[in-house]
Amino acid sequence: MVHTAFMRPAANLQREPVYLKLANTLEGMIASRSLRPGDRVPSVRQFSQQQRVSVPTALQAYATLETRGLIEARPKSGFFVRRNQLELPPEPVMRPASAPRAIAIDGADPMEALLADHADSTLVPLGAALPSAELLPGVKLARILAAIGRQLGPRSVAYDMTPGHESLRRELARRSLDWGCALNADDFMVTVGATEALSLALRATCQPGDTVAVESPTYFGLAGMLRELQLKALPMPVDSADGMDLDTLERALRKTRVAACVVIPNFHNPIGFVMPDVNKRRLIELCVPRGIALIEDDTYADLQHEGPRPRSLKAFGRTEEIILCGSYSKKLAPGYRVGYLAAGQWQSRVRALKQASTLNGALLPTLAIAEFLKNGGYDRYLRTVRQAYRQQVNQMKEAVIESFPAGIGLSRPKGGFLLWCELPVTVDAVKLSGQARSAGISIAPGPLFSPGGDFKNFIRINCGYPWNSRIERAVGVLGHLVQKAAK
């Protein structure tokens, strides 16, 4: 529909080419915020049909808007309203006040409270890092599961014997080519999600009392694992562009004996950065010659917003000294709890540890994921969901910028569906979380993501749900609470 209120004066319109009239109309809609940064505009063909013009005319209008810096084309996704980078808040600043030191972890595990909040349907789910079920291929997976169950008959209730069904391990090996690796089925073991994979990796490489280098901030479930395994954490600062501060790590390794190093180099949780390849190589060079087990959490790496999938650490050689952990919980089916690890030289050890703990896995979910990866259209599904997450992250950014006070910092996620937000220093994120919950909103306060309880004025926001009026109102309420706390 053409909004004539945004057109130039009639005298000028008569002298303007049609493509320019259309470009000016859309520019007016962008200026009035009828179309917001991050919004997808109609496809060229759709726009030409709406405005009853030829496709070349519509394309010329879009080219004009691109030249004006108002929209941008994204590969295989279409055209989107562009945000002026100068308008974006700065990225969060996460430098520690003192040099890193190894610390023992105490306190309650934050996961239970966050997951309980997610299960409470009365709360707007901005806390736990879980995607909306409506974006996941639940119906198709259910059909696959039922078909496999009928095919197996009584055998469908059997265990999936360690190291996991070969059909899934073959698919993982095939997909490892996309990760920059060339692994084979025997390199993999199927686990109960990435959580078990990380736990097995730590148990295989560390003894109680050992020190583990971790990113700060990092996945908050890691702190609970370290505590239960009686391991110390050596928090390393991270940079939004480069990942773990490797200069700081190198200095720390001269003073502290470290048994393992856990990193999320691809679409980091909670920040969303990708560690550059040159830094990945240097990280390997710092850890492997010192006998430090390098453990990579690759959970979000399939969820890039654009471009190719980033390479895993195993793509840079020394694959036997690197443990790769991953899961299909964030990408396909959280409730199926299907994860994996490729443990290199520790493969026999992690297999023995699994057999001594969870023993075996669930057969049907494992086979269903394997079938979906092979014949279910996983790549086509990923193209759709990547676009959705990118749009949802951009919509959340826009709403936060509008509702929160000046002086905040916002991450620039390159993949996944999480947003890391630095609030004014006077805001206590833990108190804010309690106030938000009373208002019907779940968020994740920053101290959860630090073994030492840092990031007291940071929050992580889940963008895994399609944008709607309920989420928009919740962000407005949250912004009001931040405004009050910042005074």
Predicted regions, residues:
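N-terminal basic, amphipathic alpha-helical segments
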Residues: M1-I148, R351, Q355-A362, E371-L373, ...
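Short beta-strand "wing" residues that participate in macromolecule-binding interfaces
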Residues: E72-A73, L183, I443
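Conserved core of the PLP fold type I
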Residues: L145, R150-R290, I295, A301-T319, ...
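Short, conserved active-site loop motifs that form the nucleotide-linked donor/cofactor pocket
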Residues: I292, I322, I408, I441
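Conserved core segment of the aminotransferase class I/II
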Residues: R318-Q387
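Conserved PLP-dependent catalytic core of the aminotransferase class-I/II
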Residues: L382-I408
